[in-house]
Swiss-Prot record:
ATP binds at L18, G19, K20, G21, S22, Y23, A24, K25, V26, K41. PANTHER family: MAP/MICROTUBULE AFFINITY-REGULATING KINASE, TESTIS-SPECIFIC SERINE_THREONINE-PROTEIN KINASE 1. Its EC number is 2.7.11.1. Keywords: ATP-binding, Cytoplasm, Cytoplasmic vesicle, Cytoskeleton, Developmental protein, Differentiation, Kinase, Magnesium, Metal-binding, Nucleotide-binding, Phosphoprotein, Serine/threonine-protein kinase, Spermatogenesis, Transferase, Ubl conjugation. Residues 296-315, 329-358 have a biased composition (Basic and acidic residues). This is Testis-specific serine/threonine-protein kinase 2. It is an enzyme of class 2 (transferase). One of its GO terms (cellular component) is cytoplasm.
Length: 358
């Protein structure tokens, strides 16, 4: 029985294909029970690596069934067929993902970015308070609802933190995520605090929101890592970012894990606080290189409204591929950094983690 027939029996009328990842495909569908459209993630156990099926998939399904937050994609139903196909029925991000939005729209005005980033940070705090880490925070995994609110999705690399006898979180040794959003310690293959890793990814996302470009060029992992370890963050002058915004990004993209901000410190940062009421004319206001915005900061989603200035590091035209190095295969790392770094949208292997750390 094909996917459409399986879903039809469950009360879902299949629509269009929304995307395809390494181990799954996503389709839209209309739920006769819920009376609205949903997204259905379909995973075939037979076509999925054993390590993913045995370790990551159970974690993802467990966490999806647990989390409940307004800025996290809702999961309505999970079921499996006798032949090993898993169907995860979720909330549909009707406005697409944040990456596509920014590629179309350009850098966001700080007021808009503040609202979205506060929503994302709130979702991450909710997860961290439950000792759940995402480990693949990136713009492609941030979906937008009809009102352009952030919805965190794709918990494929998520896990529940383990604690030792003293209550301290056990360091993670599975180096996963997407290279452009990965923290320096992860790229170096150093056992890491998973919550602190999530924080770094938040900094990359915020930079993309307000600059419309990547903070680092990930076409050369070794060079990128060197710049990150020097705590260099360059901001385009054309964006005229406020000092508070740049301060928050700079403090999040801190290579020293002991000095990197925690999620509560991010949420209490001055830039994220609601702006004080002030008189404002009804006329649109303008910021150099950003175009015109309505006084109430509504988002203009029309294609072609890119900012005047081109980004220093262009946003990827393809989704960022994930990296995954598990403890079991660390001893089989080979030196392939030079050849893989030449690929524009490459998969980070164990070799890259090992070489980047030297």
């Amino acid at each position: 029985m094909d996917d459409a027939a399986v879903l039809r029996k469950k009360g879902y009328i299949v629509g269009i294909n929304l995307g395809k990842g390494s181990y799954a495909k996503v389709k839209s569908a209309y739920s006769e029970r819920l009376k609205f459209n949903v997204a259905v993630k379909i995973i075939d156990r037979k076509k999925t690596p054993t390590d993913f099926v045995e370790r990551f998939l159970p974690r993802e399904m467990d966490i999806l069934a647990t989390v409940n937050h307004r800025s996290i994609i809702k999961t309505y139903e999970i079921f499996e067929t006798s032949d090993g196909r898993i169907y995860i029925v979720m909330e549909l991000g009707v406005q697409g993902d944040l990456l596509e939005f920014i590629k179309c729209r350009g850098a966001l005005h700080e007021d808009v970015a503040r609202k979205m980033f506060r929503q994302l940070s709130s979702a991450v705090k909710y997860c961290h308070d439950l000792d759940v880490v995402h480990r693949d925070l990136k713009c492609e995994n941030l979906l937008l609802d009809k009102d352009f609110n952030i919805k965190l999705s794709d918990f494929g690399f998520s896990k529940r933190c383990l604690r030792d006898g003293s209550g301290r979180i056990v360091l993670s040794k599975t180096f996963c995520g997407s290279a452009a959003y990965a923290a320096p310690e992860v790229l170096q293959g150093i056992p890491y605090q998973p919550k602190v890793y999530d924080i770094w990814s938040l900094g990359v996302i915020l930079y993309i929101m307000v600059c419309g470009s990547m903070p680092y060029d990930d076409s050369d992992i070794k060079k990128m890592l060197r710049i990150q370890k020097e705590h260099r963050v360059d901001f385009p002058r054309s964006k005229n970012l406020t000092g508070e915004c740049k301060d928050l990004i700079y403090r999040i993209l801190q290579p020293d894990v002991n000095r990197r901000l925690h999620i509560d410190e991010i949420l209490s940062h001055s830039w994220l606080q609601p702006p004080k009421p002030k008189a404002m004319s009804s006329a649109s206001f303008k910021r150099e290189g950003e175009g015109k915005y309505r006084a109430d900061c509504k988002l203009d989603t029309r294609p072609g409204s890119r900012p005047e200035h081109r980004p220093d590091h262009k946003l990827a035209t393809k989704p960022q591929q994930r990296m995954l190095v598990t403890p079991e295969n660390e001893d089989r790392m080979e030196d392939r950094l030079a050849e893989t770094s030449r690929a524009k949208d490459h998969h980070i292997s164990g070799a890259e983690v090992e070489k980047a750390s030297t």
